Amino acid sequence: MIYINDGSFRPDPKKYAVIADSLDKKLKTDDRDTTSMFYRALLYLSFNDLKAKPSPGDKVALENLVLARNLADKAMGLKMTNIKLEVLRAQIYKELTYRFTSDEAWKYNSKQIADRKSQFNSYKELANKYYDELAELDSSNAYDYQKLKIKYNYPL
């Protein structure tokens, strides 16, 4: 797993605001800078993962994780070859899957529940696919990647 280790349980977004702003500015001037995409996606993930925002129904966390996903996918599309990016992408998809696990049937109608289930299954499938790819790329840690795969199903 890739994470920010600054000695705290979870990183404080205020502490990294300058870095985030700098990365955002860099991405506005050069939208093909894969290193900036990687680090910005890492910050989005770190500030919106299970430890930082434990409520699965947190809409802001979901939106930020989608931004992280877009950055990671774009960096992969621009041929950034780094196993850390592949690990980060798998983690992002796993977190996105988690965001759809809460039983909020009271909040959504049947069409919205079907849409959420479809998104959950899509993210789950991609996360597991990326963990399988990582197991092939990094065979010495294959068992660990297999343990990270998502085994639960949509709750409704």
Where are these regions (language model features)?
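Short coil/linker segments at helix-helix boundaries
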Residues: 2-20, 43-74, 94-145, 149-156
